[in-house]
Amino acid sequence: MKKIKRDDEVIVTTGKDKDKRGKVLKVLDDGRVLVSGINMMKKHTKPNPMLGTPGGIVEKEAPIQASNVAIFNPQTGKADRVGFQIKEDGTKVRIFKSTNEAVDNQ
């Protein structure tokens, strides 16, 4: 089970986008995450008349290392660490380390 999943709200802890918040769009296999509005890059595209796409400069998100983001805890309003807890019925759930509340209930 991964500590950061798709649709989690995260805060960037280091880099040019430090202290910005965003929602995780995708978790890549190599330990990187794609976060909405974070680590924006400009891609120069050629026009393609076959597809009807115009050329120009397109701004899109680039992946960021998962170690450079922390999950956002809405109860404290700060970044938090994620831990795991096994319930009585044997299911494994993610919890916030500071409050011991389940992440998936938010």
Swiss-Prot record:
UniProt GO MF annotations: rRNA binding; structural constituent of ribosome
GO biological process terms, semicolon-separated: translation
GO annotation, cellular component aspect: ribonucleoprotein complex; ribosome
Entry keywords, A to Z: Ribonucleoprotein, Ribosomal protein, RNA-binding, rRNA-binding
SMART domains in alphabetical order: KOW
CDD domains with a match to the protein in the record: KOW_RPL26
InterPro entries: KOW, Rib_uL2_dom2, Ribosomal_uL24, Ribosomal_uL24_KOW, Translation_prot_SH3-like_sf
Signal peptide: none
Family stated for the protein in its record: Belongs to the universal ribosomal protein uL24 family.
Quaternary structure and partners: Part of the 50S ribosomal subunit.
Function: One of two assembly initiator proteins, it binds directly to the 5'-end of the 23S rRNA, where it nucleates assembly of the 50S subunit.
Protein name, UniProt field: Large ribosomal subunit protein uL24
Organism, as annotated: Marinobacter nauticus (strain ATCC 700491 / DSM 11845 / VT8) (Marinobacter aquaeolei)
